[in-house]
């Protein structure tokens, strides 16, 4: 029977039948041939129906013609299944052993190739795993670098904030120092005024002592000088206190106002003391002039020397 009729018998398409015939002929199996419309065609027999059905079932299971034929070769002897009982198609006794050996070698070669293919697939799978690991490592490194960059940016911002705060503190310190310098200049000017007052007081005392012209006025002059010297020393002490207060105000800016108030109060006290001394000097000058007049009129009558009086005794006429 021809291909179309045989395909209907085995319930396959003509294309599938031709494909099976091609694989059988490539493996050295020969089917019966006939001539149809001037061309050679396969002449299928009744016994071929079972063979083609078995091959079609294996192809469906393996989804491959090559694998189907390999399994069928293991299950049964194809030489006895598909070789026809035709003497012209049977090999000679001399070639049977060689043919079987060739087939065995071919099958072994195919198995080796399949094993190599499996190894190559395993290598490819292993390389894919390595590539995934490398990708994960790169991702982790990128993440760590990103975190490092964020940390660096944060530290830079902190440094900038610290620099800004330091500059602010420095500016405030500079302003405080300038204020303290102004306060110190004011204290120095006030101290110089006090020194001027003391100097004028000393000048008045010296002038009045020169006008007295006798021993009594000289004693008064010395005592006045001692009192003036004490006032000057007191003013110097007050000035040094003012200087110390100014220096302390440079270190402790919060007590500048109190130190300045104390310095002004001390200067006022020194000025009041100087005024008292000037007043007492004027009274002593008047008394010395009276004593000088009395001594000139009574030069011929010596009098016993009176007891030396102190500054405060003379001041209160004791």
Swiss-Prot record:
User: Which stretches are tagged as biased composition: Polar residues?
Assistant: 237-248
Give start-end positions of Basic and acidic residues composition bias: 175-193, 219-236, 249-274, 300-310
Q: Would the keyword Electron transport be found if you checked this record's keyword annotation? A: no
Coiled-coil region(s) at which residues? Answer: 67-157
**Record's keyword terms, sorted:** Coiled coil
Annotated region Disordered: where? 172-318
Q: What is this protein called?
A: Uncharacterized protein MW0361
Source organism per entry reads Staphylococcus aureus (strain MW2)
């Amino acid at each position: 029977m021809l291909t179309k009729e045989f395909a209907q018998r085995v319930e396959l398409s003509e294309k599938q039948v031709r494909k099976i015939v091609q694989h059988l002929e490539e493996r050295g199996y020969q089917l019966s041939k006939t001539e149809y419309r001037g061309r050679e065609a396969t002449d299928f027999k009744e016994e071929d129906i079972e063979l083609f059905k078995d091959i079609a079932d294996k192809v469906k299971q393996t989804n491959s013609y090559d694998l189907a034929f390999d399994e069928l070769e293991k299950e049964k002897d194809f030489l006895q299944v598909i070789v026809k009982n035709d003497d012209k198609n049977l090999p000679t006794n001399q070639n049977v052993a060689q043919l079987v050996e060739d087939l065995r070698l071919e099958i072994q070669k195919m198995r080796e190739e399949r094993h190599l293919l499996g190894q190559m697939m395993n290598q490819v799978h292993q390389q894919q795993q390595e590539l995934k690991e490398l990708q994960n490592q790169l991702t982790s490194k990128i993440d760590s670098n990103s975190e490092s960059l964020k940390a660096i940016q944060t530290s830079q911002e902190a440094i900038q904030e610290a620099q800004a705060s330091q500059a602010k503190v420095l500016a405030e310190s500079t302003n405080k120092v300038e204020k303290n310098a102004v306060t110190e200049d004011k204290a120095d000017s006030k101290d110089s005024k006090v020194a001027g007052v003391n100097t004028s007081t000393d000048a008045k005392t010296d002038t009045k002592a020169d006008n007295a012209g006798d021993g009594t006025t000289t004693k008064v002059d010395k005592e006045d000088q001692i009192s003036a010297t004490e006032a000057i020393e007191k003013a110097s002490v007050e000035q040094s206190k003012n200087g110390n207060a100014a220096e302390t105000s440079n270190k402790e800016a919060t007590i500048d106002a109190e130190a300045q108030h104390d310095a002004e109060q001390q200067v006022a006290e020194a000025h009041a003391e100087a005024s008292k001394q000037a007043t007492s000097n004027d009274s002593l000058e008047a008394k010395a002039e009276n004593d000088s007049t009395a001594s000139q009129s009574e030069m011929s009558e010596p009098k016993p020397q009176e007891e030396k009086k102190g500054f405060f005794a003379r001041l209160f006429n004791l």
